[in-house]
Amino acid sequence: MATKSCPQCDQQVPVACKSCPCGYIFISRKLLHAKQSQRLPPTSENRSDPKRRRTERIKRERIHTAVNRDLENRKRSRSNSQSEASRRGRGRPKTATTKKHEEEKEKQEKEVDMYANLSDEKAFVFSVALAEINRKIINQRLIL
């Protein structure tokens, strides 16, 4: 076990303890540095940054050339086209309801398009074939 010695009573105390049984309080390095920075007069660094903030990603300045402008325009046009058309996203889908609605709409459109150009003779032939298939299915169910 790691221990430290108390400066008042020279007793060995575990490192994790913040105080000694004799009453001495160990000051952590963080608190020590915070107190020292409060005592010191504000320097140029301390004035501009009174609170310590998390660092952010540094934004680089871009050199604006014709090539960069073309690339930016392409990116913008792609993002606009992608937002209009439904594109498949990464990861697990949140809900599948939109996909089902799209599939139903497509099916309805396809059905309307398929039978719009059908002649009367072809429709009759298909209806006879469909009636034959239905009759066979019904006969199979009766046997089972």
From Swiss-Prot:
Parts forming coiled coils: 94-122
Biased composition (Polar residues): 35-45
Keyword Coiled coil: yes
Any one Pfam family match given in the protein's UniProt record, by short name: UPF0547
Biased composition (Basic and acidic residues): 63-74, 99-112
InterPro entries found in the cross-reference section: C16orf87-like, UPF0547
Keyword annotations: Coiled coil
Annotated stretches, region: Disordered: 33-112
Domain of life where this protein originates: Eukaryota
Biased composition (Basic residues): 50-62
Sequence similarity: Belongs to the UPF0547 family.
Name listed for the protein in its UniProt record: UPF0547 protein C16orf87 homolog
